[in-house]
Amino acid sequence: MNSFGTRGTLEVGGRQYEIFRLPALKERGMDPARLPYSLRILLENLLRMEDGVTVTAADIEALAGWRPGTVSDREIAFMPGRVLLQDFTGVPAVVDLAAMRDAMSALGGDPRRINPLQPVELVIDHSVQVDAFASAEAFSINEELDYRRNGERYAFLRWGQQAFDNFRVVPPNTGIVHQVNLEYLARVVFTSDENAAAEGPVQAYPDTVVGTDSHTPMVNGLGVLGWGVGGIEAEAAMLGQPVSMLIPDVVGFRLSGALPEGATATDLVLTVTEMLRKKGVVGKFVEFYGPGLASLALADRATIGNMSPEYGATCAIFPVDEVTLRYLRFTGRPEERVALVEAYMKEQGLFHTADSPEPLFSDTIELDLDTVEPSLAGPRRPQDRIRLSEAGVSFRKALPSLLPTRSLTQKEAPTGVAAGPDAVGVWGEGSPDSPSLENGGASGTAGGLTNGSVVIAAITSCTNTSNPSVMLAAGLLAKKAVEKGLTRKPWVKSSLAPGSKVVTRYYEAADLTRYLDELGFQTVGYGCTTCIGNSGPLPTAISQEIQDRDLVAVAALSGNRNFEGRINSDVRANYLMSPPLVVAFALAGRIDINLYEEPLGSGKDGKPVFLRDIWPTRAEIEETVQRAVRSAMFRETYAAVFNGDERWNSMPVPAGVHFAWEPDSTYVRLPPYFEGMTREAPRTVPDVTGARALLLLGDSITTDHISPAGGIKKDSPAGRYLVEKGVGPADFNSYGSRRGNHEVMVRGTFANTRIRNVLAPGTEGGFTTYFPTGEVMTVYDASVRYQADGTPLVVIAGKEYGSGSSRDWAAKGPRLQGVHVAIAESYERIHRSNLVGLGILPLQFMPGENAASIGLTGRETYDVEGASRAIAANFAGGREVTVRARGEGGEKTFRATIRIDTPQEVLYYRHGGILKYVLRQLLSGKEKAEAISGGPATANKNGTTEAVTQNSAQSFPASDSPAY
């Protein structure tokens, strides 16, 4: 359709492209020129996708008429141009697609209809772990272990590559997904002939993306609109379903000035994160503008976009300008692409110049870049920024809250990785066999460890390794440190994990590799590593000392997240910082230090060496960038990015439309999501009655708390399951690598070693009380008993529930444990969407209320009244429900709001989840689901409207309820 007459043509380089011209709307009385850049991208998407059903003329008029201060409940359908995956979320996504093919066949449909209609690119980056370090052999050892542990998963992804159209895989140890996206995959302007499923004339349109990793907005720095979604939402997008959303608020972030001497892009993004968390931008778009844009390199912009989830925004976008074009050329994009980007963006009024009118925004915030100062963030949250000079004071203040709570379980390091230094030579050539550890020694001395000792120093994460300025600053600092005679402290596990092989090339060109090597920062792999918790084990002596003395050890990393329990189970305090500061803290060996006033150590002349003595100047950094970083490095590195090495290509790969599931596999299992599914959706959604609380939690519960990605303990439910299946602890691998096996993942849900459940006082880790007997046991074991009793479950939490990673297993796991309802003070955007997409009802306390103010103990039974009726009426009477909590002290009643936010989400929930909705759509061939009628129903604890099926050792809710 073309209701507004915007279809036109654009000729660039002798080729003609069909486009939908935004300026043409002015002729219809709608002028998008003052809309935020991000909303203009969405507007073009609606114009191009208009079909009168999914996208209507009224949708287009509503978005084109957006103005600050207007509150709209208009739902729009955004169709991303492509989907981006990483392997931890990508494997379960492909597992789900394979299971959908089986279900499609079982229900009489064509399994080939389960096929991506949008281009899908998966980068394997989340699996490699830092087993070996500080050694010339570290990379080869870690790569060997990576293939040994994950070969079955990689073969499964190679099956997916041949079984599905429009699906490409970047092999392991190539780079980090967001850096590869920034440097190579992102087009800025997409053409429809790049989509194998596209038909009709070749169209040109803005590159847009959704990704199964919350840091997908890194590409916003390039002017590409995109954000993170849960795996199931990404699967729906692959299969042609739009992303349903309300027209967002857009917060303008005005930048002025320029970064001062000594401040880095990392310091800037930590400052932005602190400011925007205080501002409150959850679920909103953030858009950067102002005179300060011109002073920021593209890599600096990408760093800011990368941490969008840390400050809660859906995206954090910069407009396309001359800086963008220079970066595209510099990273080796074809000149034809750059010419198309320039011509298209200028034609559409999307190209930013100094003369561009300032857009209108819902709200604004401002930062003078000149005020940014060296910073770090920690010990638990990215928004908790600390001035570098106050690191020691801040740590000592936080220390009481970091001291361990005794767990019921025997203390042990996570298994599934090679244990101790002897296995992999982690101490490296010329390093001590192990540090000398003596009780009572002061941190930062050779005498031993104490609270505040830095035991991990990792240059890691695409947030910073995509930025040549901060990476070369780290190399220059290392060079000066070596020349002064400094060494890293012997208890520090140091590592360098670039997000692209380009980094290695420019380090070599700058002659800095040898200095980093000398300080123990050898390359350990090209992947996420420490940033996502794949830090590997600490040397045995270090780990044992920390555990025996209950020390608060520290990780210093150039990552984007520092949630408790994320980086390493032996580490209780995690600090985010720039790469050069990571090197500095490796030299100091402790966090409780003022680097402005205290020396890093003594030089070879015996004199103290301070940070100021080795910190590189801006002029030194810029000169090194100009000299060492070359465009050819990008072209040559990415020329064969999809090809893989001999190990990748020699892997045996299964073939066929259907995947041949191995019943004994502990990595890839047929999930139970479609068991018992019928072609028709259930008529009603039952209310929940007689529910028990599985957990009562506090604020800032992350998806890492809910579904950890790191090591698996031998005595945990998941560890016991693997042992029963014949897997030794050395081969456990990580939870993240086991996401293709629901049996492992349901057992690992709420198993984070740092989670604290009020219902199991005095414990730390995944414990709860099974109230019928009063026994304290693991969350998983209690969930099995409750499901056997037919008791639905509730999780109660505080503010920012589900913050952090986009992982859908933080919703899948609770659902498979029998959780029907979550009640929280507030939700992070992606997790709330994932809960709905899995059939869990998200309820939100009324403003100013929480579990404590209402007087909930978590020991009550809970009835949710009115949800079935409200959902059946599409919330015509409002979204509020009544919750009755019955306990020994009587009954408490409170109101809560249903957080099913869009009409499309109502359909997902009614169908029992997004995957069933999509499968039924493909079976019926309908563009839109029929309205589902029927009155309210009730599911009681005896399960009168739900069946329970058995799958392996775990009971799962019936497939045709909103659960599964």
Region locations from a protein language model:
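Terminal amphipathic helices with adjacent charged low-complexity linkers/tails
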Residues: 79, 97-152, 288, 293-420, ...
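Extracellular/luminal Protease-associated
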Residues: 289-296, 560, 783-784, 788-828
